[in-house]
């Protein structure tokens, strides 16, 4: 099993796009595991990079990292957020009506995709954050908080939010008000703007493109078996071929795979994140599954 001294984990919140399937909850631990067990000299290849949580954490820890994802949209969103300023982030909060119009567009811009992420339930880019009954109320509060207080955080203590709460007489409406999730997602994007990506190599290749690698740390977060991921799908992602490739790559590299379980007996669990369970599960039972790291068994390399 790999070691992790949690006292050495970077202080502060994890960063990355608010992206479905993101490793943000465990990105700090994963990168610290890499540092403590394999050092800081080898380059890290984040080949299924998704929302960039592992890549960003590597950068904050001073590791050389290569950010790749087959879905060019997600890497473009990452670059867009980092390259823009705080005022740009304010434009990403949209109403339910605007969200639905954007969703139905055939050709979406990167701005459109970011608006869908920030304003969708579970960042799925399909369903608006709030029910139709309460969407206007919560959207208007979000806009007013940003306009009146120029803040994305601490909004629960702003006069705008407090006044809105005090003006609500209906108990059910008050109960539904809760958090203004758009502001929480914008906070995540704002933290992402603190990194410098001038020297970051970003690509959009299939994982097999990296077959040339040697003496590198290859971090893999592939579509989990019986699951679905943007860019790949359950119909065209061959898990067996992927495991064969990862096994082959482990002969000249350090290969780490994130998953709940791996059916290939050549791999074993080397670390389990016992407090992090599945949020978007491919089936009902997988809600009890925990995130794990896998490597090729010793003697199998």
Located regions from the model:
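Short active-site oxyanion
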Residues: 40-44, 63-64, 196-200, 251-255
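Short loop/helix-cap segments at secondary-structure boundaries that form the rim of catalytic
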Residues: 58-60, 210-214, 261-270
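S-adenosyl-L-methionine
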Residues: 1-45, 49, 53-54, 60
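Conserved proline-anchored active-site loop of SAM-dependent methyltransferases
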Residues: 30, 44-58, 67-71, 114-128, ...
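Class I S-adenosyl-L-methionine-dependent methyltransferase module
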Residues: 61-198
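Acidic, His/Gly-enriched loop-helix segments that form or flank divalent-metal centers
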Residues: 154-156, 162-220, 224-250
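Short amphipathic alpha-helical segments and helix-helix/interface helices
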Residues: 31, 35, 55, 239-247
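Long, positively charged, glycine-interspersed low-complexity recognition regions
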Residues: 5-7, 225-226, 231-301
